[in-house]
Amino acid sequence: MRVDLFDFELPQELIALRPAVPRDSARLLVAAGAGAIDDRIVRDLPQLLMPGDVLVFNDTRVIPAQLTGKRGEATVGVTLHKRLDLRRWQAFVRNAKRLAPGDTVDFGNDVSADVEDRADDGSFTFAFRGDEPVEVLLDRAGTMPLPPYIAGKRATDERDRDDYQTMFAREDGAVAAPTAALHFTSELIAALDERGVARQTLTLHVGAGTFLPVKADDTDDHRMHSEWGRIEHDTADRLNAAKSRGGRIIAVGTTSLRLLESATGEDGVIRTFAGDTDIFITPGYRFRAVDGLMTNFHLPKSTLMMLVSALMGRERMMDIYAHAIAQRYRFYSYGDSSLLIPEGNTK
């Protein structure tokens, strides 16, 4: 499909630079099947789901993956985006013209890394020096890697270390937050428990590639980035059991959805998973695992706009986004959210 079919105009003032306070006071656009669009707030979620439904969260934890370093007199900006092993990371680099394998970049605070190679996509492999865990080094020298549409408008600060982390964050490794889950609070979870809505977690370490623009003119020509994920055996069993009882699987965030679909066979059975996924979901895809999605609002012509269009239909999504813009919903990572239930999965 043509990539420009997923384009829309977004007023810049609708890009959220800070999250709602409290988190569950954010607005929630609800689109169930072909019915009317409903304007709610995230705190209403228990009323919108049924007992036996399952919310699936991503428990990845965002690391301070944004680094500024020196190679000689030159300053370079480094954004880690994928762990290769305990000490080696792939990274995107700004001001990298003279950076070459064999160079050492000093990030200050006794943190440095050697450049091992440069990939065809322009990214670099860095090997961090020393014996301390890389996570300890990053806590000392790194900052939170805010998306470019926020970082281009304001500086990262200490608030972001909390704001850009979900309450479910357990497993270090993401360089972008699974932002739909940012809206949850302990009070909301308690209300969902009382309603009989279950929850499960998986891990997908979101990479900076999630923000890369689609440069191809046609979706068939786009090369999707890969990310590492894991679904435990017990989690898969509980999800399959819920499905067999008629419960709906509602992915909280596109990262949860992509991993669930990667782990599910044509028979609709969710299986254990541990490895990379580069699944690219576009209109025409047949969903095998999920019955609905809670997700924030996405960038024009992005792979995630294509994903939600696959779930709901492209024209339906364009109508939903037109409504969101007209009603002044706040967009992107720190913005409002939506609950999308495709035709046939409403109750």
UniProtKB/Swiss-Prot annotation:
Q: Which Pfam family is an annotated match for this chain, by its short name?
A: Queuosine_synth
Task: Tell me the domain of life.
Answer: Bacteria
EC number(s) from the headed UniProt entry: 2.4.99.17
Tell me which Gene3D superfamilies the record gives. Answer: QueA-like
An example Gene Ontology CC term for this record: cytoplasm
GO biological process: what's one of them? queuosine biosynthetic process
What InterPro entries does the entry give? QueA, QueA_dom1, QueA_dom2, QueA_sf
Pathway(s) of this molecule? tRNA modification; tRNA-queuosine biosynthesis
Q: Which reaction does it catalyse?
A: 7-aminomethyl-7-carbaguanosine(34) in tRNA + S-adenosyl-L-methionine = epoxyqueuosine(34) in tRNA + adenine + L-methionine + 2 H(+)
Q: Recite the UniProt keywords alphabetically.
A: Cytoplasm, Queuosine biosynthesis, S-adenosyl-L-methionine, Transferase
Give the Gene Ontology MF terms in alphabetical order.
S-adenosylmethionine:tRNA ribosyltransferase-isomerase activity
Localization annotation:
Cytoplasm
State the similarity comment.
Belongs to the QueA family.
Q: Which NCBIfam families match?
A: PRK00147.1, queA
UniProt subunit comment: Monomer.
Which purpose does this protein serve, as stated in its record?
Answer: Transfers and isomerizes the ribose moiety from AdoMet to the 7-aminomethyl group of 7-deazaguanine (preQ1-tRNA) to give epoxyqueuosine (oQ-tRNA).
Which named protein is this? S-adenosylmethionine:tRNA ribosyltransferase-isomerase
Q: Which organism is this entry from? A: Erythrobacter litoralis (strain HTCC2594)
Q: What is the lineage of its organism?
A: Bacteria, Pseudomonadati, Pseudomonadota, Alphaproteobacteria, Sphingomonadales
